[in-house]
Amino acid sequence: MTAALVSGLLREGYSFAAQPISDLGIGPNAWIMNASLIGTGVLAVIFALGFRRLLPRLPRKGLATGLLVTFGLCFAAAGIFPEPSPDGPVTIAGIAHFVLGFFIAMSALTVALFLIASGLRKQRGWDRHASYPRVTAWLVVALILLTQLFFNRSSPLFKLGIGGLMEWTLFTTWSIWFIVTGLTLFRRGTRNTRNSSSALSGTTAAVTPTKEGAP
C-alpha cells in the first residue's frame, strides 16, 4: 500500500477519492504499482506457508492455506496483467487483471478469513484472536460491495466520486490484518522457540551426572 500511495502522489492529476487503484498500473511510473502488486502477492504466499507451519492444529488448515496462496498468486497476477487503457479495447490481460486480481483474489481471501476465524475459535490459546479475522472478513465483503456500487456508472452513488476511497479502505483493511496477524505469529513463534530451548536446557541439566571426587 505504501508503494501505491507513493505512485499516486507522483501521478499528476490522480484522484485517490475517485479513481481505482488499478489506474496506477498504467501510464507514468506504472512499474511502481505493478511491482508492488507482485511483491504483495509473493509476501502473501510466504505468509500462508508460515501460517501453516505455526498453527499445526488449526481445523481445515490446508484449505485456509490454499486459499491464502490463491489470493497471493492472483494478486501478483494483477501486477503481471495490468488493466487496459480506459480509451482502449478490452484485452485478455485486462480481463485477467480484474478476474484474478480482484474477484478471485478477494473471494479467496474472504473465505480464508472465515475459515481461520472458525478454526481459531476452537484452538486453545487462540480463541481470543478469532474475532479479528471474522470482523475483517465481513468488512471486506461490505467494502467490496460498496466499491462496486460507487464505481458503477448506473448507480446513483457513482456521482459521489468516492469509489477510489472505498477501494483504498478495502485494501487497507485486509493489509492491516496480514500485518497484525503476521506479527502475532512471529511473536508467538519466537516465544515458543525460546520456551522449548529453556525446557531442553533444563532437561539436559537434570540428566547430566555430577562428577564427585574429581581432583
Report the location of each language-model feature.
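Short, intrinsically disordered terminal tails adjacent to the first/last structured region
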Residues: R194-P215
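Hydrophobic, aromatic-enriched alpha-helical segments typical of multi-pass transmembrane helices
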Residues: M1-P20, L24-T190
